[in-house]
């Protein structure tokens, strides 16, 4: 079968290609650039527990050496600390330059035998039929490519989106920030800060080796920021934080980032899909566009892998858009609803004690991956089976508990995601202290193993000593991307089969014809 064509070699395209490769699906990644990104420390990303685990699982080795976990999160108002949040009970956000994330994923993709990276080629035409997609590129490799599916991960100006004729409505210039990456010593080593004054807002986020990224909120349609004006911002801000005297600093990189909010009308057209910035733009109030793109990749990869290996139903393939577009739309809606109170300059109301606390909470959520602005999304399951209550609602992300894998090793549950397989998890207290040989063939295990082997799609049987809120002998059915599908009281083969069949959207049916099938070959067709 033909490989999946991935257009775009940023973090999302590379992550998708690696996720597909991890499920045994070959990909061709078409990169318009030369295959190397210039270092830009002022362009960075924040990853939370799920996306950091995903990048690690995909083989990105730059997370450890070029990323920094927040030691704490501080908020201050008019020079006085109002809150300090630490991360003893849950993983701290990971902050790293985007070029480092891209390079780590690119190195992993380059070393994987199922991923082919093609540089210096620009897509200028595509056409579809019932069996696949044909794409034409010009540049380094002027040729036609044949794929089983095609995914546009080619950014905000997506050629794929334009060739498919998909609209991209939204709001421009929602926020504008002056950004600087600099090396200096601040009074709170390794701790991120959100500082709000009467007329300004600044964030400081640590990077390794004493480097910080500083962001100043600017008027969305204000004047250009000159180099002298930016230096003044830097000196005044550092002096305010360091007792009135500007400490020595080394300015490494600067920029002005304008944030837009947009959402593509459709994310699927036949065998062609959109992901990442090609499908959505966000970033205001601390929301993370790259992180949402990685979630797109994880959601789509297992569904395409199932279709590639054994065929998938239209319901399953449609669920990518239904789940991810709904999740991103909710994020954009939450930001739009919060913006007037946080950015509208509503006078005294903004400074009342209750209002200030509410604003602080909402601004913190996006940065720390909490609430409507930042939490990992839940996806409504096709059939909500919850025979046993647990701390995780059906559709929610599962807890990262230690589990015994099929090979007998004990690993975090998240380490086993992303392989295109369902996971069936049995909660069996005591298994963590007994040798696997003593319990694998005893009790519920033989019946459960037989039920798992009979499922309509590939699945792995795991065992955990405990799971939050779950009594002994609870069986959890987990999607390949780590979202809970169902819970059962003990071994229920028929019900487990039905739930697994619902997760895959039922048996494969005939493919739906794309809405746009002719090739587009004229250069003007992809110009705004």
Segments (PLM) and residue ranges:
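Core beta-strand elements of the Rossmann-like FAD/NAD(P) dinucleotide-binding domain
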Residues: 140-149
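A conserved short coil-to-beta-strand element within the FAD-binding core of flavoproteins
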Residues: 119-133
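Conserved FAD-binding catalytic core of PHBH/FMO-like flavoproteins
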Residues: 136, 149, 153-259
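Conserved mid-domain beta->alpha element of the FAD-binding
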Residues: 11-19, 152, 251, 257-337, ...
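Glycine-rich Rossmann-fold phosphate-binding loop(s) that bind the pyrophosphate
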Residues: 9-11, 32
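Helical substrate-recognition/capping region of FAD-dependent monooxygenase/halogenase enzymes
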Residues: 2-3, 7, 21-23, 103, ...
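Glycine-rich FAD pyrophosphate-binding loop
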Residues: 21-43
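Active-site-adjacent segment of FAD-dependent monooxygenases/related oxidoreductases
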Residues: 39-110, 332
């Amino acid at each position: 079968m033909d490989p999946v064509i991935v257009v775009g070699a940023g973090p999302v395209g590379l992550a998708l290609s690696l996720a597909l490769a991890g499920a045994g699906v070959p990909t061709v990644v078409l990169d318009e650039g030369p295959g190397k990104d210039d270092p830009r420390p002022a362009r960075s990303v924040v990853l939370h527990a799920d996306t950091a685990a995903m990048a690690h699982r995909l083989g990105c080795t730059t997370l450890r050496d070029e990323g920094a976990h927040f030691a704490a999160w501080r908020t201050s108002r008019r020079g006085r600390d109002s809150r300090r949040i630490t991360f003893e009970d849950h993983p701290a956000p990971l902050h790293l330059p985007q070029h480092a994330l891209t390079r780590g994923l690119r190195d992993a993709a380059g070393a994987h035998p199922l991923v082919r990276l093609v540089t210096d080629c620009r897509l200028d035409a595509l056409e579809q039929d019932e069996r696949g997609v044909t794409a034409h590129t010009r540049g380094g490799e002027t040729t036609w490519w044949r794929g089983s599916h095609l995914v546009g991960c080619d950014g905000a100006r997506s050629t794929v989106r334009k060739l498919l004729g998909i609209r991209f409505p939204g709001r421009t210039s929602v926020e504008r920030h002056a950004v600087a990456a600099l090396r200096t010593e601040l009074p709170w080593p390794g701790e991120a800060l959100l500082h709000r004054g009467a007329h300004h807002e600044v964030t400081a986020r640590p990077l390794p080796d004493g480097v910080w990224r500083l962001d100043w909120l600017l008027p969305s349609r204000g004047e250009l920021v000159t180099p002298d004006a930016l230096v003044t911002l830097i000196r005044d801000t550092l002096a305010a934080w360091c007792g009135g005297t500007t400490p020595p600093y080394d300015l490494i990189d600067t920029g002005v980032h304008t944030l837009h909010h947009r959402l593509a009308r459709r994310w699927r057209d036949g065998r062609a899909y959109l992901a990442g910035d090609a499908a959505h733009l966000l970033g205001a109030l601390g929301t993370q566009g790259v992180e949402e793109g990685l979630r797109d990749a994880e959601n789509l990869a297992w569904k395409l892998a199932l279709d590639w290996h054994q065929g998938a139903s239209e319901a399953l393939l449609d669920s990518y858009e239904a789940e991810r577009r709904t999740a991103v739309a909710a994020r954009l809606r939450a930001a739009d609803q919060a913006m007037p109170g946080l950015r509208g300059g509503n006078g005294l109301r903004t400074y009342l004690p209750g209002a200030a606390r509410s604003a602080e909470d909402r601004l913190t959520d996006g940065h720390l991956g909490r609430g409507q602005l930042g939490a990992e999304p839940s996806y409504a399951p096709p059939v909500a089976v919850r025979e046993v209550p647990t701390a995780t609602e059906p559709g929610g992300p599962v807890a990262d508990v230690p589990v015994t894998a099929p090979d007998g090793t004990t690993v975090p549950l998240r380490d086993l995601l992303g392989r295109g397989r369902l996971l069936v998890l049995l909660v069996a207290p005591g298994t963590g202290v007994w040798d696997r040989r003593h319990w694998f063939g005893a009790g519920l295990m033989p019946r459960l193993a037989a039920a798992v082997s009979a499922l309509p799609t590939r699945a792995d049987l795991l065992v955990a000593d405990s799971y939050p809120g779950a009594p002994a002998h609870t069986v959890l059915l987990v999607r390949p991307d780590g979202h809970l599908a169902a819970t059962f009281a003990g071994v229920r083969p028929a019900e487990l089969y039905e739930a697994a069949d619902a997760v895959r959207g039922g048996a494969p049916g005939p493919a739906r014809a794309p809405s746009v099938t002719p090739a587009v070959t004229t250069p003007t067709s992809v110009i705004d």
